[in-house]
Amino acid sequence: SRCSAGAASANDPAKRYVRFVDAQTGEPRRLAYGAALFDFEPRNVITPHAHRHMASAHLVVDGRLRVRNYDRVRDDGDAIVIRPTRDAVFEVGVVSTMSSERDNVHWFVPQRGRATTFDVVISDLDAGQPPYEIRALDPLAATPLADGTLRAPVIGFAEASARYTADV
């Protein structure tokens, strides 16, 4: 459906609501979403981790962050096969997104001081599955494969926090 995005005037854009439906039944689905600010002190890190059943966007609103992304190619026992897609420093106004199809693994480290991101997360994307799943990975200990992908071991979050510091 359509409705005005503010006071009615010729300059107002049309706003369309997005409704998600179940692919099998056509019934409307309710998704969970949230927005948050992540305030990084110079030593804070979001360690490398993979996702399921969710999508997110991370807008840098203050400072600078080194952002490393990987596509999730496949699960392989106690590891996840990943493909590097990005390793860049993001400044204010730059956004990193994540979904099942693209840049599913991310890793954020502040650069030269504090940083803040404004994040929007949507979960419950896969009907009949848990709302979300997050698994810590160890890309630095990954085994390179012949096709250019990396077999990264799944590790616990305590181990990831100890290994992946602001100096890595």
Language model segments and positions:
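A short glycine-rich, His/Asp/Glu-containing loop-to-beta-strand
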Residues: A10-P42
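Conserved short histidine dyad/triad with adjacent acidic residue
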Residues: A36-H51, V89-V92, S99-N104, V121-S123
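A short hydrophobic beta-strand segment most commonly corresponding to one strand
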Residues: A57-L59, R112-A127
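Short conserved micro-motifs at the rims of enzyme active sites and ligand-binding pockets
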Residues: V109-P110, G128-E133
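Long hydrophobic alpha-helical segments typical of transmembrane helices together
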Residues: L137-V168
